Curated annotation (Swiss-Prot):
PROSITE patterns: HYPA
Residues that coordinate or bind Ni(2+): 2
Protein name: Hydrogenase maturation factor HypA
GO biological process: protein maturation; protein modification process
Role this protein plays: Involved in the maturation of [NiFe] hydrogenases. Required for nickel insertion into the metal center of the hydrogenase.
Source organism per UniProt: Paracoccus denitrificans (strain Pd 1222)
Xref: Gene3D superfamilies: 3.30.2320.80
Pfam family, one: HypA
Amino acid sequence: MHEMSLCEGIRGIVEDQARRHGFSRVTRMRLEIGRFAGVEKAALSFAFDVVMRGSPAEGAVLEMIDLPGRAMCFDCAEQVELDDRLSPCPLCGGGRLMPETGDEMRIRDMEVI
């Protein structure tokens, strides 16, 4: 379950930011997760609760925001949204696509006190 290691990285960021900016608690965290990031949301939520114990983010509400997967189609020269990384172009049916977004995961923001 790589969601555990993802949350360990998030914890490191939270602890670093708490030291830098002097906050003691995170009450809410919003994560942006791309469609192709390979993150299982239920596993991430569970891992977040476990890994954040004893950190400023313990008990924080985790909100996950879905980001679409987009690719450039070389057959029709359009940027398209994909449901699956291996899907053909929804506009022309072409298969020559270069993924542009959808594999990212980032902290969008945190509410702190």
